[in-house]
């Protein structure tokens, strides 16, 4: 019987636990012995590896985060620690790994594969949805729902007090969360890192809207824009003339009960990952495209920066 392990690396997302649950179920279904690696690549080095069973994943499908824990391992970037990790896997006869993470995690795992021949398949897992080669990453739908609920709640109080609210989403280099949540929440302004902006260009329009009876504004910004959220709020007060508040959603976006869509995508991602490893695709990332699931190698994933969908960007012109 072959042995296969799973770990989560980097930022956690809702959807990891459903993926972990199905990993155990589908591995056993295929005659494999499933193992958990705790605390990401750190767990490979520290030998925090245990055999998994159905009882270990009972009741986790509705939980956010990851029961395995996660980490950003600097030690795994060093060859001597990767050698320790290989010895720990060899002791348990594990030669296949599934990695829930981002492109940094996949690059580290690709080095490990080239050095030691441990086969792996990556499942894109980041709420930023910024991995090149896939149009969807695990956790994004749940994060968008968390953001949507927050904006809806903030709109209630904004309208009651005639205020503007600047709502900051995650997305240091990618404005996907801010843009999609703006479109789906009726925001009056959206600012993202990918698109240059000049706040003064909005002043006349905003003042005119207030003159015509608008009582509040919802402004959604990505954390990666050139101005911080406090500066946007100060602009609204000083130049537009409306009392303003800032809400930074922060790590709330990573939590929450996994949505139906993320549970379904977790199921599909895991199926394709295990099938790939059993089908002798030794080093790949499962990507979701407009035509379905495909496997891409790490060089293809990391060769260029993720770009927002041009159609989505075209909608930004409405703001």
Swiss-Prot record:
Keyword Flavoprotein: no
GO molecular function per UniProt: 6-phosphofructokinase activity; AMP binding; ATP binding; fructose-6-phosphate binding; identical protein binding; metal ion binding; monosaccharide binding
Enzyme class: transferase
Reactions this protein catalyses: beta-D-fructose 6-phosphate + ATP = beta-D-fructose 1,6-bisphosphate + ADP + H(+)
Binding site for Mg(2+): 103
Active site (record annotation): 128 (proton acceptor)
Keywords: Allosteric enzyme, ATP-binding, Cytoplasm, Glycolysis, Kinase, Magnesium, Metal-binding, Nucleotide-binding, Transferase
PROSITE patterns xrefs: PHOSPHOFRUCTOKINASE
Task performed by this protein: Catalyzes the phosphorylation of D-fructose 6-phosphate to fructose 1,6-bisphosphate by ATP, the first committing step of glycolysis.
Protein name: ATP-dependent 6-phosphofructokinase
Source organism of this protein record: Sulfurimonas denitrificans (strain ATCC 33889 / DSM 1251)
Lineage of source species: Bacteria, Pseudomonadati, Campylobacterota, Epsilonproteobacteria, Campylobacterales
Gene it is expressed from: pfkA
